[in-house]
Amino acid sequence: MKLFGVDVGGTFTDIIFSDTETRVTAIHKVPTTLDDPSTGVVQGILELCDRQYIDRTAIDHVFHGTTIATNAILEYDGAKTGMITTEGYRDIIHIGRHQRPQNYSIMQEIPWQDRPLVQRRHRLAIAERMGPVKGQVITPVQEDQVRGAVATLKERGVDSIIVNFLFSYTNPEHEQRVKEIIEEEYPEAFVTISSEVSPQFREFERFTTASINGFVGPKVKNYIQNLEQSLKDSGISAELHIMCSNGGVATPKTVSEKPVNTLLSGPAAGILGGAWAGELTNRQKLITFDVGGTSADIGIITDSGYGESSARDTWIAGYPVMVPMIDIHTIGAGGGSIAHIDEGGAFKVGPRSAGSRPGPACYGHGGLKPTVSDANVVLGRIDEHNFLGGEMKIYTNAAYKVIDELAGQLDLSRERTAEGVLQIMNNNMANAIREKTIQKGEDPREFSLVAFGGAGPLHAVEVAQILNIPEVIIPLYPGINSATGLLTTDLKYDVIKTEFMMSTNMDFSGLNEDLAGLETQLINQLKEDGVSKQDIRILRSADCRYAGQGYELRVDLPDVFLDEETIVDALNNFHESHKAEYGHNFTDSPIEFVNIRVTGTGYMPKIEKQAIHHEYQLEDALLKTGDATFNIDGSLVKVEINFYQREKIPVGAEFNGPCIVLQKDTTTVIPPNCTAYIEEYGNMIIKVGV
């Protein structure tokens, strides 16, 4: 099969092609067309088809990672929204949980109040009420009030209507009926009901999640429609699948209805790309390290795979989001991070970034602030003639100027200042990794660090040295790792049902019936998407807690009829998980089941392993020698090093640091006392010395 993976970033759109029959792989980058990213997507696919002589009509699948929803929420640039809610509860999404994001600040910035997803004047209440336990109707929905509310919102020019009713997770009947009325009265509106997006208890989080879906919905839906039409107009009839935050892909129809599931589309694909590098190199315990121009994304992969964020810890742009997401930790640290001295006189790097325009001073686009990239230029780690394969000029004098200005404020030399910028940057990223490993009971010394993104390989080895991580893996195509990850996943859907139940008083009949119903729902959806029964896999789990707790842990449920005997392993696993997470457990205390979950995956074709073969010798890869500065035993030393061209380094040949490896999509810095080699599938393995 002929597969394309396309990941859209803020600066570049990355494309990878894989033919599963011939095992041919090709990559391409084009500038992202910010006004309409679908233009760049189609342009990149067509250019790669022309270059590789690929018949565009023979493409089978296009897998796509998108930032449309992410950017809409980060930039607060979504639809004009309205909300219909239960009488007395229109301010749930404003009040929240009385959290103070900055405990001691007298100038609080509370996102759901400062940047409301639905303006208060567009939040209309109607009479209706469901019971909190069994979902019994207490107050029937007043349809005349609904029609009046819809007419009001339509008159006010609202594009998207969100329906958030109290206790709708117990019985969605009222929300579903209101959706029908909206579609009758205002068919042009984008409609979201909370019981379809996140049918879980916790009203503030559920209401907010549904509101995000409505806020980003019209923009995502229009984008997907444009992309589908553009592909069709270009003669590409391939099936399109969109990357979701849970680590799987979904159909355009599903994503158009629930775009909130794509908020971490790109970073999730990056985690999968890191896992693919681990599979190729037979490593199971991995720390993924994706560093771009603005941010660094950290992910953890263990023997059991990647983790999923806890519902209580999942926030996007300051808003709580209660949908399944891969556990990713993001900090403001990247190649464009600005070095500065704060009001208290502290030397800091980030989180502010120069972005792509004007960008770092060394880009020559008018940047006037010292950045991490400028520090790398000063220390000789970014080559002025071979950046982006020689396609982009680096202005070293501009980098010297901004670092010198910072050095004057610090009363340090140019090189010492640049080294200080990198030390702060590297320690910030090391601390982020500590949060995801040591603070979670994992020892980073037992992991390999998989580095990718434009800036990840520049810093990975020195970050690994800080944490005593013994090995760094640089994928074959680190700059398009997220696009590669798109070709390694499956269709994946999650369904959830809130169901409170104590382990001392289990309703096994109801539990088994509900699990069977959720499984049937998923199987039907996957079959509708064209997945055959033998390619469907179902996993069951539950969110549990000790009685009286306000947070849950997820445990797997066996794929058997549940009763007092078959549930024992799940209960024991909860005790073990609680001890691993918090350092203690209460084995004599009853366990409360809160939510039951079912995850369904449908097999999709994937990229195939392809060993690399060429006739080069290591000396053929030597591009030049030059000077670079490294911290050796506490002293800055300028040394002459080799600059290697990565695509010409032969498999198995070892080479020692200090040296720098150049390729079009990134630069890899290998400090002193480190050794590297290329394994059979093209991944660079760096053995880290201290």
From Swiss-Prot:
InterPro entries found in the cross-reference section: ACX-like_C, ATPase_NBD, Hydant_A_N, Hydantoinase_A, Oxoprolinase-like
For this chain, the family text in UniProt reads: Belongs to the HyuA family.
The EC category is hydrolase
Q: This protein is called what?
A: Putative D-/L-hydantoinase subunit A
Q: Indicate yes or no for the key word Lyase.
A: no
Instruction: Return one Gene Ontology term, BP aspect.
Output: amino acid biosynthetic process
Is Amino-acid biosynthesis tagged as a keyword?
yes
User: What GO molecular function annotations does the UniProt record carry, in alphabetical order?
Assistant: 5-oxoprolinase (ATP-hydrolyzing) activity; hydrolase activity, acting on carbon-nitrogen (but not peptide) bonds
